[in-house]
Amino acid sequence: MIKSIPIPTAGVSLGLAALGNLLQPYSPLMKYTCGILAAILLAMLLIKILRYPKLVHADMTGNPILGSVAATFFMTTMQLCVYIKDFAPFLCEAIWLAAVAAHAILIIWFSKNFMLNLELKNVFPTFFIAYVGIVVASVTAPAFGYFTLGYYIFWFGF
């Protein structure tokens, strides 16, 4: 089952994490329900990445859509770190910083692999996810006190 989980599952997880944040003022229970579901999906994808790295690498390098959508993994991680930062602040901050750095590395990797020899027929709307998605870091940065970093990331993504 784990082997067949698609990379875009991270996008569903991101949607759930964002929905939970949206519902927080109305129902803390719904916030954490969405967060738990998002974390379960993300954990399943992480297990796939760890158990089948060659398969994931082949998916990402062979398909620019999957390569760009992979950024949602790091975007979700940033959001979920804010969910649980009150329980493990130092760990969450470290994971958040790692997710921001990994997203930046993904931008470089994606640019190198899919943007250097770009042809219009191979351009897809998902390309924006790789570049603009890092703005999630600017939204979540204040939770960890990284206001300046969040400011610059916002303008990069804008």
What is the predicted role of each segment?
Residues 26, 51, 79, 103, ...:
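Functionally constrained cores in energy, signaling, and assembly domains
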Residues 21-29, 82-93, 139-150:
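Helix-coil boundary and interhelical linker segments in multi-pass alpha-helical membrane proteins
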Residues 1-20, 53-81, 96, 114-139, ...:
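Juxtamembrane helix-loop boundaries in multi-pass membrane proteins
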Residues 1-47, 51:
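N-terminal signal-anchor module of multipass membrane proteins
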Residues 30-43, 89-104, 148-158:
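Structural signature of hydrophobic alpha-helical transmembrane segments
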Residues 83-86, 103-118, 136-146, 158:
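Internal transmembrane alpha-helix with an interfacial aromatic "cap," most often the third helix
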